[in-house]
Structure formats: C-alpha cells, structure tokens
Amino acid sequence: MLGTRASKLTMVDKVPPSFSSMERMRHISLFILLGAGGSLLLLTGCTTGRVASGAPYHVTAYRPHDPSAVRVKVSLSKENIYVMEGDRSLMAVACSVGIPDKPTPKGNFKIYAKEEQKRSGSYGFSVQGNRIVPSTGGGPGRYVGYPMGYWCEFAPAYGFHQGFVHPYPRTHGCIRLHGEAAPKFYALVKIGTPVNIANSQPEDETLGPKVQRVDDSKTPDPPASLMVTSGAFQKPSGPLLE
C-alpha cells in the first residue's frame, strides 16, 4: 500500500478503494501549491538542470500563428510534452506519466473535452461545518469534488491536468503538468487538437535536452480548506502566451 509523502498521487489519478482515510486525504491534498499563491515558476529552453520544490521555474509558451496547426507530442520515456506548430516549438515542458501498472495510453488521440475548473464527480471532500473529510460522494455533508484544473481530455478518463510533477512515472495514466505550465497548455490546445503519445519523439533529441526538470516530490501538502474553494483554480500572473 502506498504511504508517506514519497508516494503522493494527484488530480485525476484514481484513489484505490483500499486507501485508508488518511491515505486518501494525502492523495487528495496535493493540488493547491501549484494553483494558488506559492506556485512555482518554470523555465524551459535555456537550461537542463533539475529544479527542486520552491525554486524558480518559469514556462515560456508562444502564441501559434495558426491554432489549427497545433500538435501535442508526449514522450513517455523522457516524460516531456512538446506542443508544436509544424517545426516550431510553442512549449516544451516536463510532465508526470502513468506508472507501469497503470500506464498512460499510447497512440493518436484528439483533445475532445476541456474544463478549466473541473472537479471530480467520484472523489473529493465532504464539508461538514468546519470539518472537511475525504469523500467519494454520498453520506453526510456537502460533497465537493477534487479539483482537476485545466483538464484537457484525450481519451475516456484520461487527460492532461494540473498537478505535482515528479522525476519518475507517478500517475494512474493521466499526464500531469506543473501549475505554471498547465494554464499555458490549456491556452494552446483546443477541441480537436491532435495528440500523439509514444515511448519517444523526434523532439527528444532536439528539444528534450533543453527541458528543465522539476521535482515536486517533497512539496508539502496544501490544506483541504483551500481545496474546496475557487482558490484551487487560480491562474499564474501575467500573460499566458508570448
């Protein structure tokens, strides 16, 4: 069974039914530092070092000349996302992908659903006065779904979304983007944007070495009291696209 801080899961990564209440809360309580005050900054395209939690990390995303020409490529082996317009790189960032037992699906897909402030209908929180406890719906209290910010669905129950990025596969099949990158990815793609997911991509050789890594594995858990508010969906400051 997963335990402790090193085994955190986030966003739409499914909560196994065997999780204890405390483990489920740990699973649920990981989003806010990436979406609210204290979100990290992402820098791509100029350095290859690893950035630890709390270090500056800033993503530059470029506005496409032709939005209909935007393509998304995911390299599972490198855990990189390349947003391309022809040969032009619009954004190249690190991500977290599925663990071996729950892999991210490979193949050609299209973005077919987007929701900036999506919440889960199957797990989240029960708000009971001043008490907030993990919940899968039903029971006492007011149910508030787990925040799945900047959700871009490419296959049933699989999507790109905001969450902690680890330097190793960590999700239950979805693709997590850092809190500074997820809103920019959301702005770049539209319904119908093609997505290719493969073990490797040609861009691994050209763009991959320039993608700065990030390690959120030791980022502290945010409070559940913020998870149930709109503060879970705050945008980064400044323009999303250059």
Task: Locate each region found by the language model.
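Low-complexity, intrinsically disordered Ser/Thr/Pro- and acidic-rich segments
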Residues: L2-T4
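Bacterial N-terminal signal peptides that target proteins for export
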Residues: S20-L33
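Bacterial N-terminal signal peptides
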Residues: I32-L42
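Exported/periplasmic cell-wall-interacting domains
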Residues: C46, V51, R119, F125-E242
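Cell wall/extracellular polymer interaction/catalysis modules
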Residues: C46-S120, G124, G137-G141, G149
